[in-house]
Amino acid sequence: MAFSESGEIRTVARFDKVVEAPNWMRTTGELVYNSGGPIYAWKDGVERRIDTGVCDCCNNDHVLSPNEDAIAVSHMTFDSGFTSRVYIMPFDGGEPRLVTPNSPSFLHGWSPDGKELSYCAFREHDSRREVDVYTIPATGGEERRLTFGGFNDGPEYSPDGRQIWFNSTRSGLMQVWRMNRDGSDPVQMSRNDNNCWFGHISPDGKKVVYIVYHRDHLMPNEHLPNMQCELWLMDADGNHPRRLCSLFGGQGTINVNSWSPDSRLFAFVSYEWE
């Protein structure tokens, strides 16, 4: 589905399977999503599977490189408990390269300069498991923790690469925040009475779309599937927030940035009970 700022909802495809988290390709106009583990690309009714090699259990946290010649995915394994690690591979197929040996790691952003990835990670600190925003060189290396306190998720870069948008419970409810790329100067951008997740900045840097769960339906640190939720839009300075629509969805609806290149539309997924 796609939603325009003017309020028009257009259904572009219906599936008899669960699809999640579309990315909108600038170069081909395809929508890239995960379904049942593999990654697919879709356009004009034609679906093709992307060759992700051994990464055949991808969750809904995947992004394209700035020039779209590569894709980074969060690949899950269950041999030693639940794990998720970030891999990069050529978009036209090839051997995946491990980027984050530590797990669980859930990818959300690729910097515009192509040098860095941002992700949410569960890590042990002082005998406590904390959930924070991290960055790591796209070539691999040492990860860097950017957030401290609260439950922090959904980090993605601003179009100019200077800032990172993320969501955090540090103010109580889950809200959309923004900070500098090095983690400094965090600022709360949404001020909703409900829980706000996954703020996605438009390519022109002017608008942010995000998903909202009712505070009575979930804990602030939860974002589950099969929920009644809403999509909201605000200006990039946090002003003029407004509800766009209600839908049945949640996890998988809009986990990663899905804006069209011209910033007029964004893609999302809603679900139906059979």
Language model feature labels by segment:
Residues 38-40, 81-87, 128-132, 173-177, ...:
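Structural motif
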